């Protein structure tokens, strides 16, 4: 299996805290489906921002690989942020939102959009089930509809890696099931990194698991033990409710 991303002993953070994540090492492979879990404040978002090049590591190395397994300076990455970070009052249509995913990697004409780009938008909209909403302003969409549109935006340029940050935190349970079916289809074409607080969802959806709590614990597969989770979450005790691929409950630190 070919690597697309290799992270080796990476430290990163911000001016007021340059070591939010510490000595993190793991790899992502082509068509991989990696789930990232961990307590709030553990560094999950910092890790994502570092992978996307928004934060520069203070130590360590991030290496990307092309189809020929040669190291390259970057790869095409799609990103779906948390839904609550999207301004639905912004005057833009569904078509324009999906199309904007192309403008991030190539310069689009200011006034006339080439037909091939319009066709690409239509293909992606149909894949997302929003083909009848292309002319609708995003302010008129439900949470589930908007998330489908944003997912379409993140994949329209055929990225090698798709990063999802808590993608279903603000949508209903009915949409959640359909959303993960869409991800399964997308995963046939690209690798996915999925961040979620829902351990049950992670275990039933992904192939491998990474727990980020300043440092990182990688687990190949999803048959993880309570001992492994205890070690991974460290100072954030929790309990697993039920059996198998089930939701978890995070508890306050024990005194």
Regions found by a protein language model. Give the residues of each.
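A short, flexible loop at the N-terminus of ABC-type nucleotide-binding domains that lies
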Residues: 1-23, 30, 87
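Helix-to-loop junction immediately C-terminal to a conserved catalytic motif
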Residues: 52
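Conserved ABC transporter NBD signature motif
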Residues: 60-77
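Conserved ABC ATPase "signature" region
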Residues: 114-133
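Conserved ABC ATPase signature
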Residues: 137-141, 145
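Catalytic Walker B motif of ABC-type/P-loop ATPase nucleotide-binding domains
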Residues: 162-166
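ABC ATPase nucleotide-binding domains
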Residues: 223-255
